[in-house]
Amino acid sequence: CAAAFAELKPSIGFVELTRSGVSKYAGKNCPVYVADSGRIKRIETCLGTGESYFRAMTLLGHGDWQGKSIVIFGSGKVGSGLITYAHRYGCRVTVVTRPSDISDRVRSLCETVIDATDGIAITEAVSTADLVVTATGVPGAATASCPADVFNRSKALLANMGVEDEYGAGVPAGRVLEAKRPLNFILKDPTLMKYIDATMALHNEGAVILASGKMPSGLIEPDDATEERLLSICRKNGTISDELDYI
């Protein structure tokens, strides 16, 4: 995880769980199986992280979602999960993103999609929102096209679900829940195990694949057949079979 053992010299190769760790394997003369590259990892990053935002907000005493206006910055893995759960809980969803980045399925769950460069529309949405949450992974993304003062004056509860400060220096840490730290980190279980077990199964599968034969050096992505086999097990025996269509 996060290339924690990248400096070691394995006799067979590495299995890496996270995208953030991949760059540290550059130049390694061995195979690196990247579990993060497949569909299965979306169960954790999309569904698991999306669910955890609402669980964290409930822990803080904000659990009434029906009809609430939420502005979500980003429509990648984490953003898509937030959009999915916001829609399921009855929120009116506005997403700020690059239009080319949002899938048709995710777009269908949104009331409004705003181009990330449209500062006027972003300002209006943030000014009237009940909730604002960032999930772009880009420092300062929220204030790139919208003045920081708009967020400071808004009545919305501001939160961040990325590791970067996506609000920028113009929005004080005290204005954002948990001082801009990823909100789900307040939870005892930031991501529930039911959203992680398939990823761990794929991680273990990677070790079996590397051990079963000579693999070429470089990054190796999970093959479709392996992922579909594990997903079939999840659908049959898991507790989130009704959610898997969202990945």
Cite the ranges covered by each PLM segment.
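Phosphate/diphosphate ligand-binding glycine-rich loop within oxidoreductases
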Residues: 1-47
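Adenosine-phosphate binding glycine-rich loop
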Residues: 33-67, 157-247
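A short, aliphatic-rich alpha-helical micro-motif
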Residues: 65, 123-127, 151
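Short acidic low-complexity segments
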Residues: 109-128
